[in-house]
Amino acid sequence: MAGHPKERVVTDEVHQNQILRELYLKELRTQKLHTQYHVNPLRKVHRITRKPMSWHDNLEEPADARFLNLIHHAAQGPTKKYPEAQTENQEIGWDSEALVDPERRDHRMNHFRVYSDITLYKAKMWSLGEDDRHK
């Protein structure tokens, strides 16, 4: 049945010590202390490259004009690099100029915020905490 406690087996300390000793000796067999080091001739050797952004490594090198032009050309936006859009996604924002010159004084298209006495009064009331905006 599930409720009965099991009897504890008394551990033999001599037997437990013998098990721990065998475990310790097995671990010592797998460990090896390396005191002599050498290069493995079968391993591929990779050349360590210099850091491209460090200033002290690049002092003696002259600036390559062709490489600098290539970097500056790659940093430009696609509209400056190409005369036409190269992909369909570029076509969406390719012509960023307005089709119609915006006339700021034309009130038919430009609805600027106009402040009068009543709008300033109501804005002040709302900022002070009046919450009944439906009156």
Curated annotation (Swiss-Prot):
<dbReference type="Pfam" id="PF14886">
    <property type="entry name" value="FAM183"/>
</dbReference>
<dbReference type="GO" id="GO:0005856">
    <property type="term" value="C:cytoskeleton"/>
</dbReference>
<keyword id="KW-0963">Cytoplasm</keyword>
<comment type="similarity">
    <text>Belongs to the CFAP144 family.</text>
</comment>
<keyword id="KW-0966">Cell projection</keyword>
<dbReference type="GO" id="GO:0097546">
    <property type="term" value="C:ciliary base"/>
</dbReference>
<dbReference type="GO" id="GO:0005737">
    <property type="term" value="C:cytoplasm"/>
</dbReference>
<keyword id="KW-0206">Cytoskeleton</keyword>
<protein>
    <recommendedName>
        <fullName>Protein CFAP144P1</fullName>
    </recommendedName>
</protein>
<feature type="region of interest" description="Disordered">
    <location>
        <begin position="77"/>
        <end position="97"/>
    </location>
</feature>
<dbReference type="InterPro" id="IPR029214">
    <property type="entry name" value="CFAP144"/>
</dbReference>
